[in-house]
Amino acid sequence: MGAGILPTTIRNGKIWFLFGKENKFEKSAPGFSDFGGGKDNNETPLETAIREGGEELTGFLGTDEQLKKQLKAHGTYNIDFAENKYRTHIFPMKYDPYLEKYYNNNQKFIQKRLDPNIIKTSKIFEKAEIKWICIDDLPKMKPKFRHFFVNIVDQIIQQKTEIAAFIAKSNGTRKSRE
């Protein structure tokens, strides 16, 4: 089963998700999605999600061990696509208004200077951009998502009440630990 991570926060009373956009060389399924991919060997879906998330976010959310610790500390809200095909692990994350800017500037800088063949073949350049997207904007943004991820977007919209409760509960837990 393939899997990915989807950082989520509550900001100004609304749910926000951090999505990644594929680089310009992805022609078969361009657009936004979570940070994920296929499993390696005998990985669990969570192990796959952590490895893929670390690769696609190029360490911006920490090492694999730091991501694992964060996901295990607060748990994940899971959305499955086509039973046993793909799982998105939604997890709470503190909103960082500069994360988009730093990641996107870093990617632009590096990708402008590297040989395009490196960008095409390296796992760490799959996402050219990240973006915080409010749940209220998901319906109109559906055409901008990767075609296979639209089903997960639909499930996120349908389950927004449960996701909000999960994130709010986790945020309360995090605040008590700080």
How would you label these PLM feature ranges?
Residues 12-13, 25-26, 40, 93-99:
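Short, charged/polar surface micro-motifs in flexible loops or helix N-caps
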Residues 1-35, 89:
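N-terminal strand-loop-strand
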Residues 13, 21-28, 61, 72-80, ...:
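Conserved, well-structured beta-alpha core segment at the onset of a catalytic domain
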Residues 34-74, 89:
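The catalytic Nudix box helix
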Residues 11-12, 80-83, 123-125:
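Extracellular/periplasmic catalytic domains that process cell-envelope and extracellular macromolecules
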Residues 62-115:
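Acidic, glycine-rich loop-and-strand cores that form catalytic or ligand-binding grooves
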Residues 8, 91-94, 135-136:
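Structured loops at beta-to-helix junctions and adjacent beta-edge loops in soluble globular domains
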